[in-house]
């Protein structure tokens, strides 16, 4: 499907109502989708996705997202604890900015569980089958991890080792 046809289909779907947000990839310049969303009272999530890693310019990119949309969203692929700490520091940079911070892949699972501690307004869970790397089921987020009950005051403790995903600790 051509890009223009995709945008038109999205706008038609938005006009049917019932949506609060639309997610627009950051490489799409000011678009008719954004204009339609705002005219319909919807908020625009401006997002970047990086399936390879955490971009070196992540902080400037997040600031750019925050200035261009109602909500800034980053979905990147951390490969180590330093990458995870970088994602946590984004909240310090944009404390009062609506944002969604997601780490994809095995290293990113903690960002989905600790989304409130990271300052994210929401996280994404699947209906049992992951649609993105590292996605946790909505059931596990709620019942196993109690992600909705965690917050800024939640302490973080870790199990050191590799791998640890199988651990009951």
Label every model-predicted segment.
Residues 1-32:
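Glycine/small-residue-rich loop that forms an oxyanion/phosphate-binding "nest" at active or ligand-binding sites
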């Amino acid at each position: 499907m051509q890009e223009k046809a995709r945008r038109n289909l999205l706008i038609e779907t938005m006009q049917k109502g019932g949506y609060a947000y639309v997610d627009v990839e950051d490489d799409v310049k000011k678009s008719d989708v954004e204009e339609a969303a705002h005219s319909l009272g919807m908020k625009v999530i401006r997002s970047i996705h990086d399936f390879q890693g955490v971009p070196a310019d992540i902080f400037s990119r997040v600031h750019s997202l925050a200035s261009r949309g109602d909500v800034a969203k980053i979905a990147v692929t951390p490969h180590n604890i330093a990458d995870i700490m970088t994602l946590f520091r984004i909240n310090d940079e944009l404390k009062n900015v609506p944002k969604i911070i997601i780490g994809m892949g095995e290293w990113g699972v903690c960002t989905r569980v600790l989304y409130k501690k990271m300052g994210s307004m929401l996280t994404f869970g699947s209906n049992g089958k992951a649609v993105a790397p590292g996605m946790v089921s909505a059931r596990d987020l709620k019942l196993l991890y109690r992600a909705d009950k965690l917050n800024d005051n939640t302490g973080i403790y870790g199990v050191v080792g590799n791998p640890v995903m199988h651990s009951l600790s």
